[in-house]
Swiss-Prot record:
The chain crosses the membrane at residues 16-33, 39-62, 78-99, 130-150, 157-178, 199-224, 233-255. This is Cytochrome c oxidase subunit 3. Component of the cytochrome c oxidase, the last enzyme in the mitochondrial electron transport chain which drives oxidative phosphorylation. The respiratory chain contains 3 multisubunit complexes succinate dehydrogenase (complex II, CII), ubiquinol-cytochrome c oxidoreductase (cytochrome b-c1 complex, complex III, CIII) and cytochrome c oxidase (complex IV, CIV), that cooperate to transfer electrons derived from NADH and succinate to molecular oxygen, creating an electrochemical gradient over the inner membrane that drives transmembrane transport and the ATP synthase. The lineage of its organism: Eukaryota, Metazoa, Chordata, Craniata, Vertebrata. Component of the cytochrome c oxidase (complex IV, CIV), a multisubunit enzyme composed of 14 subunits. The complex is composed of a catalytic core of 3 subunits MT-CO1, MT-CO2 and MT-CO3, encoded in the mitochondrial DNA, and 11 supernumerary subunits COX4I, COX5A, COX5B, COX6A, COX6B, COX6C, COX7A, COX7B, COX7C, COX8 and NDUFA4, which are encoded in the nuclear genome. It comes from the Eukaryota. GO terms for molecular function: cytochrome-c oxidase activity. The gene is mt-Co3. It comes from Mus musculus (Mouse).
Length: 261
């Protein structure tokens, strides 16, 4: 490798963007095949190639940042800006769902019976499973903060315990959300209420699954002594993402579950 006189990371040629694009093609084509022809062959192949690409790409990034020293302070600064912009883009994603919900609920049309929830819809009780889900996510926000402080203070065992608790709470939230979906009396095809409810809460649920995966990777890296109090952007990004998921859920709970019911 040629000598460089700057602190920026010049990425080496990698096949993973190509395999990632190919897996995205397989995933979208597989979804079409599944929806229209009830065949999951392409979808399964797309999921496998996507998982393989993610694993190998992340492995390369971890090796470059942890063992080869490519993630200098100026590179970490750029990564932080990138993560902030990514979270901002996600905020606007959810803003679209909230806009659709409030646009439909504040001035319900005659087609909906002139009321909200629409005639024939039995909304979920916000004081049952949704309130438990809120408590679970708020507790996970506390535990991820505990993990961060433990890392900064060099308390490895506390960090491991707090991170494991956060992951377990995230998985528990996902199970509760799935059980709630099975108990609803309406579906995503039941007009604007069903579509906005399942789209907003389902998209948030997907983010919880992604965040839980992110934290599991961080726990495995922590067990391999990858993080120090000075060099831990991977965990920091996961913590930011998890707090974002917490805040979005609070807005979902107040808007869709409590006020919308």
């Amino acid at each position: 490798m040629t000598h460089q006189t700057h602190a920026y990371h010049m990425v080496n040629p990698s096949p993973w963007p190509l395999t990632g694009a190919f897996s995205a093609l397989l995933l979208t084509s597989g979804l079409v095949m599944w929806f229209h022809y009830n065949s999951i062959t392409l979808l399964t192949l797309g999921l496998l190639t996507n998982i393989l690409t993610m694993y190998q790409w992340w492995r390369d990034v971890i090796r470059e940042g942890t063992y080869q020293g490519h993630h200098t302070p100026i590179v970490q600064k750029g990564l932080r800006y990138g993560m902030i912009l990514f979270i901002v883009s996600e905020v606007f994603f959810f803003a679209g769902f909230f806009w659709a919900f409030y646009h439909s609920s504040l001035v319900p049309t005659h087609d909906l019976g002139g009321c909200w929830p629409p005639t024939g819809i039995s909304p979920l009780n916000p004081l049952e499973v949704p309130l438990l889900n809120t408590s679970v996510l708020l507790a996970s926000g506390v535990s991820i903060t505990w993990a961060h402080h433990s890392l900064m203070e060099g308390k490895r065992n506390h960090m491991n315990q707090a991170l494991l608790i956060t992951i377990m709470l995230g998985l528990y939230f996902t199970i509760l959300q799935a059980s709630e979906y099975f108990e609803t009396s309406f579906s995503i095809s039941d007009g604007i209420y069903g579509s906005t409810f399942f789209m907003a809460t389902g998209f948030h649920g997907l983010h919880v699954i992604i965040g839980s995966t992110f934290l599991i990777v961080c726990l495995l890296r922590q067990l391999k002594f990858h993080f120090t109090s000075k060099h831990h952007f991977g965990f920091e990004a996961a913590a930011w993402y998890w707090h974002f998921v917490d805040v979005v859920w609070l807005f979902l709970y107040v808007s869709i579950y409590w006020w919308g019911s």
